[in-house]
Structures are given as C-alpha cells and as structure tokens.
C-alpha cells in the first residue's frame, strides 16, 4: 500500500477479510429467501409476538400472521421487537449515525485493501476502503443521536473523517468526492 501514512507503525494482515456491497448483498439474500418460500410483509407494523409450539404468532396492524421463524431485521427498531419477546430482559438501541466521503471510481485504486485504524469505544473507527464498484469510501464517524431517523451529515463530522483518515492514508484525493 504505497499511500499508507508515514506515521503508521504497524499493521494486521487479514487475508480472509473482504468487502461487499451492502445493498447488493441485502437484495441477494432477499431474493434467495423468496426462492426458498419466505413471504415478505412490507409496510406492516408488528404489534405483538407470541411463541407457539411450532413457531410464532405475529400480531400486526394488518392482521395476524403465523411463521415457523421470525427474523428481527428491524434495524434501529430491533429493540422494540426484542422487548416484545423478552420483556424481562429489555434492550435499548442507542441510535448512531456516521459521516462518510464517497469518492469517484477514478480514486478507487488509491488503496488496494481496507485500511482500518485501531478501534475505539464507539466502533471500528474511520476506515479507507475500495468498494466493489471501484469507488473509494472513507469514514465513518460514530455520533450517538436521539432521533432514530437521523441521517444528517455535518461539516464537523466530515472534518473529523478527513483528519482521522489522513492518519492512516496520505494524499487522499478528496477533490474526487461525489
């Protein structure tokens, strides 16, 4: 990696590590699930979950459903579903957002591998990585927020990403941000 910062003193080589396109992976998993008989119920609010001998009864705002298996894929609202099933062992998701730079595919060759820094208490830290589509992705920050729907990007957050990414990788072509 010719663009590793001069200040970098150590590295961990993880040859089995890899990158995926999270959107493409999600669609592929959903397509595979559909081909295997999974029925999706979009725009439906779960109001209750009851364990049955052979599966689950799911109460929704569109009527009840029964399923052998329920996957809690509620994202930042997964705590609500968890707490319906395990009210004596509740969990709370603290929402967090992150700022990123996405650079044009012409910048994708700036690094050949995902460059992580030492993780902190808020996560994996800022990384610099090529994407499966040839772009360069830099980030994220990790900001606790109140609003589970909060997706704002801030100048301060982008400044933090720029500074932290520069500790690991030099000469990042940020002018190619898209």
Q: What are the roles of these predicted feature ranges?
A:
Residues 1-42, 47-59, 169-173:
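Flavin (FAD/FMN) cofactor-binding and adjacent substrate-gating region
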Residues 48-50, 64, 69, 74-178:
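Active-site substrate-recognition segment that forms the wall
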């Amino acid at each position: 990696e010719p663009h590793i910062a001069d200040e970098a003193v150590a590295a961990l080589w993880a040859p089995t590590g890899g990158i995926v396109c999270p959107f493409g992976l999600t669609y592929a998993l959903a397509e595979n699930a559909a081909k295997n008989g999974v029925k999706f119920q979009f725009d439906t609010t779960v109001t209750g979950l009851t364990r049955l001998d052979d599966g689950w009864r799911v109460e929704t705002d569109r009527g009840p459903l029964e399923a052998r298996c329920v996957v809690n894929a509620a994202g930042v609202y997964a705590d609500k579903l968890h707490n319906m099933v395990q009210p004596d062992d509740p969990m709370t998701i603290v929402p967090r957002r992150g700022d990123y730079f996405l650079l044009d595919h012409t910048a994708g060759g700036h690094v050949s591998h995902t460059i992580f820094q030492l993780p902190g208490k808020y996560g994996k830290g800022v990384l610099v990585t090529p994407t499966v589509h040839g772009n360069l992705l830099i980030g994220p920050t990790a900001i606790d927020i109140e609003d589970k729907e909060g997706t704002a990007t801030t100048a301060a957050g982008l400044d933090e990403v720029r500074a932290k990414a520069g500790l690991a990788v030099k000469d990042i072509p940020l002018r190619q941000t898209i």
